[in-house]
């Protein structure tokens, strides 16, 4: 019996919505990354984007365990000499709550063109409102 290999044109990408309120950041991000990659589908193929679209709402209400709220530091560089910037989880969740989930999920996806295409299927919103009602997303309990 031959091994099934998914073709990019035959893959069906579904839309799912996840409520991040009260969920742990790492556990939530790991499941989202797995679904963006398509590992939950029987037709998963490593070199084809078989994953689904994921909408995350209430990103501002995600939680972390232990002292990570004050100790976890996010770094980015401005591309100017000496331009490394840092911000703690507490400050980032106030300033841009979407970035906490995006950063966690991006680190769990493959690096390269396929991983970047998978990451584009992630839509994160700080509040409960999202503009994707036309896609009729299904509720996903994680």
UniProtKB/Swiss-Prot annotation:
Highest rank taxon of the organism:
Bacteria
Gene3D superfamilies named in the record: Ribosomal protein L13
Keyword DNA-binding tagged: no
Q: In its keyword annotation, does this UniProt entry include Nuclease?
A: no
One GO BP: negative regulation of translation
Q: Name one GO cellular component term.
A: cytosolic large ribosomal subunit
The record ties this protein, via InterPro entries, to: Ribosomal_uL13, Ribosomal_uL13_bac-type, Ribosomal_uL13_sf
Keywords (A to Z) from UniProt: Ribonucleoprotein, Ribosomal protein
For this UniProt entry, the molecular function terms from Gene Ontology, in alphabetical order, are: mRNA binding; structural constituent of ribosome
Chain segments annotated as coiled-coil in the UniProt record: none
Q: Which family does it belong to?
A: Belongs to the universal ribosomal protein uL13 family.
Known HAMAP family for this protein?
Ribosomal_uL13
PANTHER family membership: LARGE RIBOSOMAL SUBUNIT PROTEIN UL13M, RIBOSOMAL PROTEIN L13
Quaternary structure, per UniProt, is: Part of the 50S ribosomal subunit.
Q: What does this protein do?
A: This protein is one of the early assembly proteins of the 50S ribosomal subunit, although it is not seen to bind rRNA by itself. It is important during the early stages of 50S assembly.
* Name this polypeptide is given: Large ribosomal subunit protein uL13
Point out the gene that encodes the protein: rplM
């Amino acid at each position: 019996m031959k091994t099934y290999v998914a073709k990019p044109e035959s893959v069906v990408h579904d839309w799912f919505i996840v409520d991040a309120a009260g969920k742990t950041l790492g556990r939530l991000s790991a499941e989202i990354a797995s679904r963006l990659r398509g590992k939950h589908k029987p037709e998963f193929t490593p070199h084809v984007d078989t994953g689904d679209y994921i909408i995350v709402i209430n990103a501002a209400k995600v939680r972390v365990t232990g002292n990570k709220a004050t100790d976890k530091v996010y770094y980015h560089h401005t591309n100017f000499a000496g331009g490394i910037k840092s911000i703690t989880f507490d400050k980032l969740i106030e300033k841009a709550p979407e970035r906490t989930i995006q950063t966690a999920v991006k680190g769990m996806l493959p690096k390269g063109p396929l991983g970047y295409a998978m990451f584009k299927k992630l839509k994160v919103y700080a509040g409960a409102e999202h503009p994707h009602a036309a896609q009729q997303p299904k509720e996903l309990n994680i």
